[in-house]
């Protein structure tokens, strides 16, 4: 069994140059059951939720906004991420392992989706900061074309950042893990973990905290009946992200310290490995919540879902598909593309609930 930020294998003992063998067979057995069950659950819920987001956004004829572009790419990142989980489930419960190409490809797609999802969440917070705090100056920059260009840049960054995580991965026997050159064996795992901590958590948290803090300041300075709801939703986003990702990143940091011999005691090593498995599953399940807190909560997105539902009903019933926006919705769409005076949640959406 393996966790993604700890190259520890399926053997029942862990060996250390300065200590005796540490028995971890019971933890390996627990992890085999625990990870396989929860990987399957995360896959099922994450697949359904994010597929709904993609279908709703791509099937609507309504003009897209920069918000829609970012939500679509966030859903695609999460889909890429969860698509690898059945392979990891197979890896956890099977004794045969992967083919080398499958090992490398699965690891690559996993980390690209992993970093892509976090980067798009960060970009969404920056976009909201621009739409609300810098509303007057950002309206010309918040176009669909700008969203597409930014999204391509985010994908490129995700691939670049993910590369150190999978470039040395290969299948060795029954295990899919990092096979580092001798000169990098000591430093590369440390660099991987440090990169994950900084670029995958610390930097995004700092950016999100600053953006949403400034947004809340701006909301307090204006008069709007949706202000209280918007602030609650902002706090929900930050708190949920922090609660789901902090324990896992703490364990990655402790795993790094273990590489330097900070946990020579066998019981501490066992506890660390058990905690890493549990917190990893909690962190990964965040992709199941993204559709709920970033898309489904929005009034505009719920309209997308209603139109998608009508299309599906028409197809199932064998009726012609005629789904169009009513005049009131068309007018509302035009109004949503105008920046409100002092309180703009999205210059192209105007939807307070989308301020998540």
Curated annotation (Swiss-Prot):
Keywords: Adaptive immunity, Cell membrane, Disulfide bond, G-protein coupled receptor, Immunity, Inflammatory response, Innate immunity, Membrane, Phosphoprotein, Receptor, Transducer, Transmembrane, Transmembrane helix
Modified sites of kind Phosphothreonine: 347
Topological domains annotated Extracellular: 1-26, 90-105, 169-195, 254-277
Cysteine disulfide links: 103-176
Coiled-coil features, chain-numbered ranges: none
Transmembrane recorded as keyword: yes
Membrane-crossing residue ranges in chain numbering: 27-47, 69-89, 106-126, 148-168, 196-216, 233-253, 278-298
Post-translational modification: This protein is not N-glycosylated which is unusual for G-protein-coupled receptors.
Residue intervals annotated with topology Cytoplasmic: 48-68, 127-147, 217-232, 299-356
Subcellular location(s) of the protein: Cell membrane
Membrane topology label: Multi-pass membrane protein
Phosphoprotein found in the keyword field: yes
Single GO MF descriptor: C-X3-C chemokine binding
InterPro entries found in the cross-reference section: CCR1-9-like (IPR050119), Chemokine_CX3CR1 (IPR005387), GPCR_Rhodpsn (IPR000276), GPCR_Rhodpsn_7TM (IPR017452)
Cross-referenced PROSITE patterns: G_PROTEIN_RECEP_F1_1, G_PROTEIN_RECEP_F1_2
GO CC annotation, single: external side of plasma membrane
A biological-process GO annotation: negative regulation of angiogenesis
Subunit structure: Found in a ternary complex with CX3CL1 and ITGAV:ITGB3 or ITGA4:ITGB1.
Family (UniProt): Belongs to the G-protein coupled receptor 1 family.
Protein purpose: Receptor for the C-X3-C chemokine fractalkine (CX3CL1) present on many early leukocyte cells; CX3CR1-CX3CL1 signaling exerts distinct functions in different tissue compartments, such as immune response, inflammation, cell adhesion and chemotaxis. CX3CR1-CX3CL1 signaling mediates cell migratory functions. Responsible for the recruitment of natural killer (NK) cells to inflamed tissues. Acts as a regulator of inflammation process leading to atherogenesis by mediating macrophage and monocyte recruitment to inflamed atherosclerotic plaques, promoting cell survival.
Protein name: CX3C chemokine receptor 1
Organism: Oryctolagus cuniculus
Organism taxonomic ancestry: Eukaryota, Metazoa, Chordata, Craniata, Vertebrata
